[in-house]
Amino acid sequence: MHRAPSPTAEQPPGRGDNTRRTPQPRFKASAPAMALPRTLGELQLYRVLQRANLLSYYETFIQQGGDDVQQLCEAGEEEFLEIMALVGMATKPLHVRRLQKALREWATNPGLFSQPVPAVPVSSIPLFKISETAGTRKGSMSNGHGSPGEKAGSARSFSPKSPLELGEKLSPLPGGPGAGDPRIWPGQSTPESDVGAGGEEEAGSPPFSPPAGGGVSEGPGVGGVAAGGAGGGPDRLEPEMVRMVVESVERIFRSFPRGDTGEIASLLKLNKKLARSVGHIFEMDDHDAQKEEEIRKYSVIYGRLDSKRREGKQLSLHELTINEAAAQFCMRDNTLLLRRVELFSLSRQVARESTYLSSLKGSRLHSEELGGPPLKKLKQEVGEQSHNEIQQPPPGPESYAPPYRPSLEEDSASLSGESLDGHLQAVGSCPRLTPPPADLPLALPAHGLWSRHILQQTLMDEGLRLARLVSHDRVGRLSPCVPAKPPLAEFEEGLLDRCPAPGPHPALVEGRRSSVKVEAEASRQ
């Protein structure tokens, strides 16, 4: 029954104390690893707070559900102050300023937040590889829960390539294909880094990426891939956006005057430097694939060789669209390479139109995803249905009495001034003013296209019609104008003023009034 002594019990007291204390520092060192991000939203929040030196608020943001950086950027003033109060930052305005500055940098230049998270332990959930545009919301990416077989490999391969990725994203590699060329798109990962990432980088095409060879000016070896490569990579616009740009360029180019050979020669003579750089393009054949590549290289508006752009700053969607539009214009008219002011104006016009059409289509697709028809179609169908129901009332035994009045003004007018004929018609048509429940227009159609305004109008019409029915029924029972119903003394004077009838009724009334006056005078005497 005696248990064997443990190995730690046989050790000296000093050594045993050391062994008992060693797990405590390890536990403290691994405690921050529990707060490392596990999803894309948490990773974006981690990097923004790390940029602002506010990582102490990270767990508070996660506990409050603030793992959406885009929500912080799009929040209004009151909503943003409420969020700051929830995370305990409202009483520290300097922290709020730093966070706002980091959010502005994240919105304008998400490439600065692409550095990997340091010290990722092997036992934690592996972080998937995200692109340089992790700050954008577009793109379907996994939530980081990989298969059990690749967890250890992904976590191990993340730390060794961190310095390489950081240097590669911030500055071009000295020995790479784009050495010395600041126009090479920053952050293009090497094949080795792609293999270590688990092949999850092709999840979606980010919106903030250079166009198909138009946003980036590559060298001769890289330009062929950018111009003729298949599929959309991280340095391209979306195919749908490119299609909108091409359609807008073709529409504008129909009414655009093209330059002639004499204009080309005169412009090249005036600018010798420009002639040395783009003069060979005008000598190339139109069917030469190299010509399109050269046009895309020298038609770039943003991100040129001679531009003073901050290193590592990515092009925005508007800039990429302008570059693509400029390339499309120059491929249709090569003389625009020499008229860059005019080219820039045309490209900006195309970018505005394409961005508007893209946002309009996105809103329509969003409404279709919610399950409802487009708003314009809904209004048209509701208007047509209400017009048809008003013009074509449902048939019945007495079709001249509609089931409901089409307007509120007619009901109020008919109730305000009624003649004798109106009373008689109301009394005679009382059964027809209450159609059977099947004919009531209160039942919604099967397709559910009734608008709220039409439903309220119908309910008001029904209420007015019921009130009119009650008032007419009461007047019919009390009116002396209707035969077989003797008048009552309490309603005589009011009703005789509204519907005077021929006969002895006025004389009787006057006689009764004179007799009442005589009796009153006799009682006074």
From Swiss-Prot:
One of the record's GO molecular function terms: transcription coregulator activity
Region NCD2, residue ranges: 267-356
Crosslinked positions (Glycyl lysine isopeptide (Lys-Gly) (interchain with G-Cter in SUMO1)): K379, K517
Cellular localization per UniProt: Nucleus
Keyword RNA-binding set for record: no
One annotated GO biological process: negative regulation of transcription by RNA polymerase III
Gene Ontology CC entries for this record: nucleus
Annotated Basic and acidic residues bias: 510-525
Region (NCD1): 35-113
Expressing tissues: Highly expressed in brain and thymus, and at lower levels in spleen, kidney, heart and testis. Isoform 1 is predominantly expressed in testis, whereas isoform 3 is more abundant in thymus.
Alphabetically ordered keywords of this record: Isopeptide bond, Nucleus, Phosphoprotein, Repressor, Transcription, Transcription regulation, Ubl conjugation
Subunit structure: Homomultimers may associate with EGR1 bound to DNA.
PANTHER family associated with the record: NGFI-A BINDING PROTEIN (PTHR12623), NGFI-A-BINDING PROTEIN 2 (PTHR12623:SF6)
Stated role: Acts as a transcriptional repressor for zinc finger transcription factors EGR1 and EGR2. Isoform 2 lacks repression ability.
Annotated protein name in UniProt: NGFI-A-binding protein 2
Organism: Mus musculus (Mouse)
